[in-house]
């Protein structure tokens, strides 16, 4: 994701980021890039995605507080809030939006598609089903990212090894999330 982001950041140009944003979790930099990070929930793996994204930028010389302003917002598992966050990033004319998890990625793409603001997503299990990528995996616009597709075959093998006498297994999923629905279809009935 960091390599893709670097390419997108190069296209963003270097903007003055005298940000008047009063968001308490936004840091500031004198000259550099403005990035909005939208995260769907507080969760260890999603937190790791955010931290890894920022670490990747830092390794490339783009560092929060030096030449990078970050406006981090958490949707608290609410898709309406994810949309509001994405709209606010577009209104603020962020240089790039990093969207963590499928609902945030879909909201960011929908909000930014006509605004010439690149979107980088992560923690999206099925970018094609989420309409963030074409069937062949190519970009659908100014959006790119990484997938965290689940290894269904390996999971089933592990379940069989741990519970060889199991006749049925239950799978919990969220019907309102595209990634969840597409993943559950991977399991044999």
Regions found by a protein language model. Give the residues of each.
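Bacterial lipoprotein signal-peptidase II cleavage site
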Residues: 8-30
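Extracytoplasmic "Venus flytrap"
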Residues: 34-60, 71-80, 176-180
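Stable alpha-helical elements in mature extracytoplasmic
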Residues: 45, 49-56, 81-85, 93, ...
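Rossmann-fold dehydrogenase core element
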Residues: 136-146
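Bacterial N-terminal signal peptides
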Residues: 1-7
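Beta-alpha junction/loop-to-helix N-cap segments that form part of ligand/metal-binding clefts
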Residues: 71, 75-134
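An alpha-beta-alpha
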Residues: 35, 53, 144-189
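Short beta-strand elements in bilobed, periplasmic/extracellular small-molecule ligand-binding domains
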Residues: 61-82, 142-143, 188-189
